[in-house]
C-alpha cells in the first residue's frame, strides 16, 4: 500500500501514480548510493544506540516536542517518521565529516525519506560532541519535517514517470517549465520560490534549535578556531550577515574545511537572501510574513499570502515578483512529419 506524506495529492490516474511512487518508496537503501563509505541506520535505531552508549538524547526529543506543537499551528500535524530518516556514521572514508551541510543529503520527496549524517567526525558510531550533534539533529529533522509536510501534486508524465507539478507555493508545467526562475549566482536578494521555501523552513528549524540550546544550556565551543563554534551559531540561527566568510573553510583541514565552505555558501545563497526578502517585503511584520509563507507551503494555498502582499504592495505582487514570463505561454507547436 502506498505511503503518502500528509499533503500529497495524486492527480489523473491516481492508481498508476501510486504504483510508480510505491516503487520509489519501498527500498530506502537506494538513497545511500552516493555514500557507500558510510553506514546508515534509521534515526530511531541511532537514538537507541547512542542512549545505550551514555549519550543524552533528550535535547532531540525536546526539539521534536517543540516542533510538533509549533507545526500544528501552521497546519502540519504529522511529523516525518523516525523510520523514514537514515543517519550515516561509522564511515570508512578517512577524515569524513558529517552534519547538516554534508553533501548529497536532505529530504527526498519521491522516496518520502530523509538522508542525513551525524555531526562531526564520521569515523565512529557515537558523536564526538554529543551536544552539538543533538542540536544539528534537531535542526535537520525539524527542517525535513517541513519538507515532508509541504503540499505536493503528482501526475504521471507521458513517459510513465512521476512528475511533481506543485511543491508548496511553486509550480511546474508537465513540460518542465517552472513558475519561478533561478536567481543570478551573485544575487544578494531572491525572486526564486525555491529559495523562499527553503529559507522559511530553515529559519523555523533554526529557531526551534535555538530554543533547545537555551533549554539545555548548550553554548558550543568558545573559539572560532573550532569549527564547532561556527556550527553552533549556524544551527541556532545566530550568524551575522557577513558570516561565515566565503573562505571560511581555509582554517580547517580536510572535510571539516569543506563543511565550513558549504555552510558559508548556504548562508549566503539561502538564509541571507530570504532574510533580505523578509526585510524588503515584510518590513515591521517579518514574523507574520514568515508564518504566512510556512502556512502556504504546507497547505499549497497561496490565498492569504497573496492577499497580504497585495494589501501591502499592490495587486498582483506575488505573480509580479516570482512568475517567469514564459510560464503560461502556449507550448511550441509540433510540426507534423511528412509521410
Predicted region positions:
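Active-site recognition of the HExxH zinc-binding catalytic motif
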Residues: 135-160, 202, 206
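Auxiliary, metal-adjacent structural segments of Zn-dependent hydrolase domains
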Residues: 27-121, 130-134, 152-155, 162
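Short, charged/polar micro-motifs that form catalytic or ligand-binding hotspots
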Residues: 127-139, 187-195, 264
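N-terminal low-structure segments adjacent to metalloprotease catalytic domains
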Residues: 1-30, 323-339
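Pan-zinc metallopeptidase signature
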Residues: 225-339
